[in-house]
From Swiss-Prot, chain B:
Residues 763-806 are annotated as: Disordered. The lineage of its organism: Eukaryota, Metazoa, Chordata, Craniata, Vertebrata. There is a cross-link at K123, K427, K676 (Glycyl lysine isopeptide (Lys-Gly) (interchain with G-Cter in SUMO2)). This is WD repeat-containing protein 75. The gene is WDR75. Keywords: Acetylation, Isopeptide bond, Nucleus, Phosphoprotein, Repeat, Ribosome biogenesis, rRNA processing, Transcription, Transcription regulation, Ubl conjugation, WD repeat.
Length: 517, 830
């Protein structure tokens, strides 16, 4: 025959953010360390080699920070004007940066003075990068040109003059030493090949391009302006998807170390994390100011975000919590379990399988044996009422369905009844629990009305409950008034007779509930 | 071509199984139970119905094994007869005509030639226990008029009579009295419960009685849940009783085990209680049997118990209180809210079943397929408790979706409402809960319908409610990157001037939705959810609403509470016709344009079948039932019939079933009930030696096929036989008067020979190719044969000899041929 059916606990949709593996992953950072820089932080770049230092470009300085240091371990400050886009070479030993005066400077990490200076741009250089062969530097400037420089003899190799507005972002391919990409305020992203003298591909972004990113495989291109757009390079620059999740210009892009997630920072003070398979937002970070730069350390260990107010926010991943092994309870010896395991079935033996035991919650066990008061006591325990009020409400509902709620509530002393009243006071006004709890409150009042006035503690609770109900009634009346006003507005706007639109309301309390005390 | 008789209303399936105690056969292989006018024989192992014993013309009220022959069964009926059956072959052996209504039957091993029955003779509510002497006679029908009175003024129910201690006494209870009649002394002792005079404790009246099989001990069950064990009742003064109390509600039935060591009791709690050694401490329970226990019976072998339940079910329970088999009929315990539906996949009838369940009932095999637990809550069976009721259900999208609505209303303002949507899972072959919606409406849901259009890409459900709204629910893709999920959400909410929405209905192609708001019918476009038009006849609230189908899809039909049936034309938006008809049930046929309407009048219910295109009905049958008809449904036939007559054409592709207020399921048929018996039930003739196990069905079937083959060959031979009549020898033998014929000994050989001859020629004709080979064989075997013939010649040198020898050789030949045939078949088999 069918076994005991456990009480169905009403589940309610959890409001707010859903807990997914992504939220768990991206929330697993310590509280951010804030470092004040001299000006807006325009670029943060991690060294690809251990110990994974990072370069922060702010105002006319470039600071190199160690991963866990809050003070810069090195500073490059020989810029006459604002520095831009300090970028590490793949081996982490060289650093290149552009500047407002049109110069491009190459530094050795250990040195102080620039190793090379590339002169040729006439206006501010906002983007520089090393090519994949490590011996060339690509730069883009506000004079609409993109230049390729040779590091050994610090000469200009090529100049592309295809953009018709400021070139503000760019990146070199990590696979092919000859390919690089630039994005410009003329709304285009262009791919250049150093072996030819002109661009090999151009895509129309639609807005000024603030940041570009090439996937490690080189197959996909991400460009950010007002929106983030993903382009398929292998199909000749076809638009794959347009992400419109930010409501202000997106200024920086970054890939997670696994390549599975794309991060974008925006002037709307948010960093969003997208899945690169479905291009859906899986997580979002909030920051205090508009974000200009963003970088992720190796293995996503650190997130560094630079903002317009010069604050650098550094978040470190929490170290894997080592679980303290609890002192193990003494269990029967292993031999007990293994006993008879390798017994072979003989011919005349009948194998009897033990039926799987169904685990029942304690309150279910009580209900199964019709111990109704005990079941109610169990769920009125403060640990249960605070953490999982829906269980308490479901048990009260079940007792009501069984017609024994009054019996279970009766015969309680001062302490127990104040437990019940505490629970009612906390949850009575919640619309999802109200229908069940109003009924329970009525029963309690009916039962304990004759003995009222004997305990000041309980009397106070009843008065509290009364005040709560009165407040709720006022609130509901106000809501109804608002609803009436809205109805009137809708009625004037309605075009057609007969059709109507339902207004969702939070009907909680029928007004005839009066709690007397 | 089916012979066209008149269409009759026939009761089909789902009759009660729990009317009386079930009876076990002596070897516990079979269990018998009364079921309407029949007695059903079930196997206790396979739960299959092995036989249906039909012969009574009225309700069967009692069955008992023949104490003198355990292979026979007595049954009594309200038609005034006692019948004796051979239950293994399902044959009626004898009928005893008593002549008055028999209400219960008892047998005693001690009273060999008589049985006890309960009759009411003078007044309608006074019942007597009488013994009937069954005369010994060879004829099929015997009059048994020899009645001797035993006890008067007893309860009608057989639960209130018990024979005890090998038939020494009989105990009967009624209200507050227990009377014991001793057969030897022919005296009656009467005991009254002391508290019965006291009005305060008036709840302890007797409900049932059982007697210990070997000791002088009577157990009686009471209304207040107590069981009293009476002893020493030979003395009116010194009698004692002890009380056993566990049940909190009425004790429905009691039974002692065969040895008498334990007592079984059951009641509304649906718990079987076993009291060991008649003490209150030693008790065992078998809980959660599903419904009120109505009867308990014990097998004579003592290894099985069985309980009959109010939900039309018999549970067979092992001695160690483990349920081993469930024989489930159509559940009829409770009122039917959901109406009758057809599951598009299994073609089973679907309706309310056990509390909180939907039952799937196969009409073809008259058997419950399964129960679907909808409410999924522990069922507390208690008097006066307001239960959650499953009020509405609908199938959609060819059986892929099932929507159910459950509600519980304690007070006017406190309504609990829940809608559940179930998806059919092909892997598990069952419905799985997909979406649960709490309070889909503010008030009761009055109607529920799926859009069943073939080309609809998105499943759509519409609910109409008393709160004045109808809501459209659609299946939406709720999946994110982590998991795939689909769920139902509300898509549109419509209302019309705050009237209560009472019915809703989709057109066949799903393009239009009709929703009735009290007196007004509104038509909505199902794509844009715009109100297209309204119809109003001011003839009372709309009770039923349905669209025409196929060629009549431009019509909309509505039946109102004031007894008007209206048909609107959707193209002209005008009333096409109306008729004065108090329609109770209106059901469209899914396979044709026909619509069946059942009207209710003071006399009874009438059936009208019509097409929406014309107001003149195709078929009218008056007086289909004296009761109110609650629900009806068209069930598509597996094999279409071919009635040519215009009046019966509506039955060609579908069959119409309806359910009356007393919950009997009826249908229309032209065949006689014998014809309607399914061949499956005939196949299940169990052989004595073979237990009816699943293996039996496999092997039995195989064997049956072999039997059929044999039969065929036999038939072939039988067909040939008439030809032999043409042979002059036989005709001479048969037509010559006996007194002029020579002696039989003389004729015999001639007769036999003539038969052999004819046979031989026949077979030769049949297998002409074999003839050559035969001849060859003959030549091969000729040496032997010659030897043989020579021998014969040696032994018998009579005048007649030659002829006989020749004949003998022929017969010899035939035998040889037979051997040869066997040889060949054997080679072929290699």
């Amino acid at each position: 025959m069918a076994g005991y059916k456990p009480v169905a606990i009403q589940t309610y949709p959890i409001l707010g953010e859903k807990i997914t593996q992504d939220t768990l992953y991206w929330n697993n950072y310590k509280t951010p360390v804030q470092i004040k820089e001299f000006g807006a932080v325009s670029k943060v770049d991690f060294s690809p080699q251990p110990p994974y230092n990072y370069a922060v470009t702010a105002s006319s300085r470039i600071h190199i920070y160690g991963r866990y240091s809050q003070e810069p371990i090195k500073t490059f400050s020989r810029f006459k004007d604002t520095a831009y886009c300090a970028t590490f070479r793949q081996d982490g030993r060289l650093l290149v940066a552009g500047s407002e005066d049109g110069g491009v400077q190459l530094f050795d990490i250990s040195g102080r003075a620039p190793l090379r200076q590339f002169e040729g741009h006439t206006k501010a250089v906002h983007t520089v990068d090393f090519t994949a062969d490590k011996y060339h530097v690509v730069s883009g400037a506000d004079d609409y040109t993109v230049k390729l420089w040779d590091i050994p003899n610090s000469k200009e190799i090529l100049t592309f003059k295809e953009h018709s507005d400021y070139v503000r972002c760019g990146c070199a391919s990590k696979l092919n030493p000859d390919l690089f990409i630039t994005g410009s305020y003329d709304h285009t992203v262009k791919m250049f090949d150093a072996r030819t003298s002109e661009s090999v591909l151009s895509v129309e972004h639609g807005q000024p391009v603030e940041s570009v990113l090439l996937f490690p495989s080189g197959g996909l291109l991400v460009s950010a302006g007002r929106y983030v757009k993903v382009w398929d390079m292998l199909k000749g620059g076809q638009l794959l998807v347009s992400l419109k999740n930010h409501h202000k210009t997106v200024t920086c892009l970054c890939l997670s170390s696994s390549g599975q997630r794309l991060l974008s920072g925006s002037l709307d003070r948010k960093v969003k994390v997208y899945s690169t398979t479905s291009y859906k937002v899986v997580h979002s970070f909030d920051y205090a100011a508009s974000i200009l730069s963003l970088a992720l350390a190796h293995e996503d260990e650190t997130i560094v975000v630079g903002m317009t107010n010069g604050i650098l926010s550094v978040k470190h991943r929490k170290s894997e919590a080592k679980k303290e092994s609890l002192p193990r309870r003494r269990r029967p010896a292993y031999r007990t379990f293994i006993k008879g395991k390798n017994y072979m079935k003989q011919r005349d033996d009948i194998l009897i399988n033990r039926p799987a035991k169904k685990h029942l919650e304690l309150y279910d066990r009580d209900l199964k044996h019709f111990r109704i008061s005990k079941a109610l006591d169990r769920v009125l325990d403060p640990t249960c009422t605070i953490k999982t009020p829906e269980i308490t409400v479901s048990i009260i509902k079940e007792l009501n369905r069984r017609g024994v709620l009054a019996n279970a509530l009766a015969g309680r002393d001062e302490k127990e009844i104040s437990h019940v009243l505490n629970f009612l006071i906390r949850n009575l006004s919640q619309p999802r629990f109200a229908p069940v709890l109003i009924n329970a409150a009525e029963i309690i009042i009916d039962i304990y009305l004759p003995v009222i006035g004997q305990s000041p503690v309980v009397d106070k609770k009843f008065l509290l409950l009364q005040g709560l109900v009165e407040k709720e009634i006022d609130y509901q009346r106000e809501l109804l008034e608002t609803l009436g006003m809205m109805d009137m507005l809708f009625a004037t706007m309605r075009r057609k007779e007969g059709t109507s639109v339902l207004e969702h309301t939070s009907d909680g309390f029928p007004e005839n509930k009066k709690i007397e005390s | 071509m089916v012979e066209e008789e008149n269409i009759r209303v026939v009761r089909c399936g789902g009759s009660e199984l729990n009317f009386r105690r079930a009876v076990f056969s002596a070897d516990s292989k079979y269990i018998f139970c009364v079921s309407g006018d029949f007695v059903k024989v079930y196997s206790t192992v396979t739960e299959e119905c092995v036989h249906i014993l039909h012969g009574h013309r009225n309700l069967v009220t009692g069955i008992q094994l023949n104490p003198n022959n355990h292979l026979q069964l007595y049954s009594c009926s309200l038609d005034g007869t006692i019948k004796l059956w051979d239950y293994i072959d399902g044959i009626l052996i004898k009928t005893f005509i008593v002549g008055c209504k028999l209400h219960a039957l008892f047998t005693l091993a001690q009273a060999e030639d008589s049985v006890f029955v309960i009759v009411n003779k003078e007044k309608p509510d006074i019942f007597q226990l009488v013994s009937v002497k069954l005369p010994k006679s060879s004829s099929q029908e015997v009059e048994a008029k020899e009645l001797s009175f035993v006890l008067d003024y007893i309860n009608q129910s057989p639960k209130c009579i018990a024979f005890g201690n090998e038939g020494v006494y009989v105990a009967a209870v009624r209200e507050f009295y227990l009377s014991v009649y001793f057969f030897k002394k022919k005296t009656t002792s009467r005991f009254t419960l002391s508290s019965s005079r006291n009005k305060k404790h008036a709840k302890n009246n007797f409900t049932c009685v059982a007697c210990h099989p070997t000791e002088d001990c009577i157990a009686s069950g009471h209304m207040d849940g107590k069981i009293r064990l009476w002893r020493n009742f030979y003395d009116d003064k010194k009698y004692t009783y002890t009380c056993l109390h566990w049940h909190h509600d009425m004790v429905m039935d009691l039974a002692f085990s065969v040895t008498g060591t334990s007592l079984l009791s059951g009641g509304r709690e649906s718990v079987l209680v076993e009291w060991r050694d008649a003490t209150e401490k030693n008790k065992e329970f078998l809980p959660r049997l599903g419904a009120t226990i109505e009867h308990i019976s014990v097998s004579p072998a003592g290894d099985l118990f069985c309980t009959s339940h109010s939900d039309n079910k018999i549970i067979i329970i092992h001695r160690n209180l483990e349920a081993s088999a469930v024989i489930q009929g159509l559940v009829k315990d409770r009122s039917i809210f959901t109406g009758l539906m057809i599951d598009p996949r299994t073609k089973a009838l679907v309706l309310n079943g056990k509390p909180g369940h939907l039952q799937f009932y196969s009409l073809q095999s008259d058997k419950q397929l399964y129960n679907l637990d909808i409410i999924q809550q522990e069922y507390i069976n208690d008097y006066g408790l307001i239960q959650i009721e499953l009020t509405k259900a609908a199938f959609g999208c060819f059986g892929n979706w099932l929507a159910t609505v459950e509600q519980r209303q304690e007070k006017e303002t406190e309504l609990e409402l829940q809608m559940k949507l179930w998806m059919y899972n092909k892997k598990t072959q069952g419905f799985i809960l997909n979406t649960k919606i709490n309070m889909p409406h503010e008030d009761c849901i009055t109607a529920l319908c799926f859009c069943n259009a073939e080309k609809s890409e998105q499943p759509t459900l519409v609910t109409a409610s008393k709160d004045g709204y109808f809501k459209v629910w659609i299946l939406t893709d709720d999946s994110d990157i982590y998991k795939k999920a689909v769920g139902w959400t509300c898509d549109f909410v419509g209302s019309y001037h705050k009237y209560q929405a009472t019915n809703c209905c989709f057109s066949e192609d799903g393009s239009l939705l009709a929703v009735s708001f009290e007196e007004i019918v509104t038509i909505w476009d199902s794509v844009t959810w715009e109100l297209k038009c309204t119809f109003c006849q001011r003839a009372g609230k709309i009770r039923h609403l349905c669209f025409g189908r196929l060629t009549c899809s431009k019509y909309l039909l509505g039946a109102t509470e004031n007894g008007i049936l209206c048909c609107w034309n959707l193209l002209s938006c005008a009333l096409e016709w109306n008729a004065k008809l108090n329609v109770r049930v209106m059901e469209p046929d899914p396979n044709s344009e026909n619509i069946a309407a059942i009207s209710q009048s003071s006399v009874g219910s009438d059936l009208f079948v019509f097409k929406p295109s014309e107001p003149r009905p195709l078929y009218i049958q008056k007086g289909i039932s004296r009761e109110k008809v609650q629900w009806g449904v068209f069930v598509p036939r597996d094999v279409p019939e071919s009635f040519t007559s215009e009046a019966y054409q509506w039955l060609n592709r579908s069959q119409f079933y309806f359910l009356t207020k007393s919950q009997s399921l009826l249908t229309f048929s032209t065949k006689s009930p014998e014809e309607k018996l399914t061949p499956t039930s005939k196949q299940l003739l169990a052989e004595e030696s073979l237990p009816t196990t699943p293996f039996y069905f496999i092997l039995g079937k195989h064997r049956q096929q072999q039997d059929e083959k044999l039969n065929e060959t036999l038939e072939n031979e039988l067909v040939q036989l008439p030809l032999t009549e043409n042979i002059p020898a036989i005709s001479e033998l048969l037509h010559t008067p006996a007194h002029v014929l020579p002696s039989a000994a003389f004729l015999c050989s001639m007769f036999v020979n003539s038969l052999l001859l004819s046979k031989e020629t026949k077979s030769a004709k049949e297998i002409p190719e074999d003839v050559d080979m035969e001849e060859e064989k003959e030549s091969e075997d000729s040496d032997e044969e010659n030897d043989f013939t020579e021998k014969v010649q040696d032994t018998s040198n009579t005048g007649l000899g030659e002829d006989i020898i020749h004949q003998l050789s022929k017969s010899e030949e035939k035998e040889l041929r037979k051997f040869r045939k066997i040889d060949y078949s054997w080679i072929a088999a290699l």
